[in-house]
């Protein structure tokens, strides 16, 4: 019964689910929990978790999540769009900080729609990021997007490079 509830009514999602199951290593033991994880068609939380980890410098955790998306052949364009959106939101936050607002005032600003559970992450991001670093990362992201579209078979290699670039922007102090 639990498996039935997890399946979507959308036939494309069901087809994707069967593809994910067939891509699993044949020698690997498949238990019920692993099967539930594979057929769970709601990857949104994991994507946001991956991007948040990346944006606060947890490269290894974010890259492991990225590998999971590569295994299920998740759209690189969707990942890039969400990273770009996070950078744009962070730009707004930094501009507000430069206009004299405190971190608390920024994360509680209704126009930004920052979820309460993300407040501590944004506090960290505001410590790590500057407008110039974001601009440099957005430029690299746009180049990555072009590469992913023109050389689709290498899209996850380009995403890996982008993740490394973002990580080094956070960790290397000018």
Where in the sequence are the language-model features?
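Helix-rich C-terminal "collar"/helical-bundle subdomain used as an assembly and partner-interaction module
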Residues: 58-174
């Amino acid at each position: 019964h639990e498996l039935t509830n997890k399946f979507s009514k959308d036939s494309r999602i069901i087809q994707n689910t069967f593809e994910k199951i067939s891509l699993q290593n044949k020698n690997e033991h498949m238990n019920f929990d692993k099967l539930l994880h594979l057929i769970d068609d709601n990857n949104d939380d994991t994507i946001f978790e991956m991007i948040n980890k990346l944006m606060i410098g947890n490269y290894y955790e974010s890259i492991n999540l990225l590998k999971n998306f590569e295994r299920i052949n998740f759209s690189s364009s969707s990942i890039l769009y969400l990273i770009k959106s996070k950078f744009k939101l962070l730009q707004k936050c930094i501009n507000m900080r430069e206009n004299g607002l405190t971190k608390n005032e920024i994360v509680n600003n209704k126009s930004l729609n920052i979820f309460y559970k993300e407040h501590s992450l944004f506090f960290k991001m505001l410590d790590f990021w500057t407008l110039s670093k974001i601009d440099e990362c957005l430029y690299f992201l746009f180049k990555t997007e072009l590469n992913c579209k023109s050389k689709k078979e290498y899209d996850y290699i380009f995403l890996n490079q982008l993740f490394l670039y973002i990580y080094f922007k956070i960790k290397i102090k000018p």
